[in-house]
């Protein structure tokens, strides 16, 4: 588990500073940060960058795969809705990528078997009343570990 922070359209200096001071181990970019932003940030730090992409079309997938971020995160767009995007849009992706959006214990197994993501990103499905729920987090961790043992 790495300490990370989600940034949405932050000035490039902010994630660079927090990464370089080792306040966080990786930055997750969820705004309109383009490839120029990512290139600039990569000149300011050698720490891990994850860029989130809202997936609506195959063109969105192609754009994500071309990203210079260390990892890409494919999401349905609006966070915390519990909705998945159209998984049929996802081809076999050759680079490490994260799957997000509407994931919970009830669909983790099918998502991992079908899409083979490098990692999954869970948010609202492991919360109770808007706060992370340790029991739900453990349940999700156990579910992922069981799936990994099957693969």
What do the PLM-derived regions correspond to, one by one?
Residues 6-8, 31:
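N-terminal glycine-rich "phosphate-gripper" loop used for MgATP/nucleotide binding
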Residues 21, 32-124, 128-129, 133-151:
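Short loop-to-alpha-helix "cap/lid" segments that border enzyme active sites
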Residues 1-2:
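Short, small-residue-biased leader/transition segments that mark boundaries at the very start
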Residues 15-21:
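RNA substrate-binding interface of SAM-dependent RNA methyltransferases
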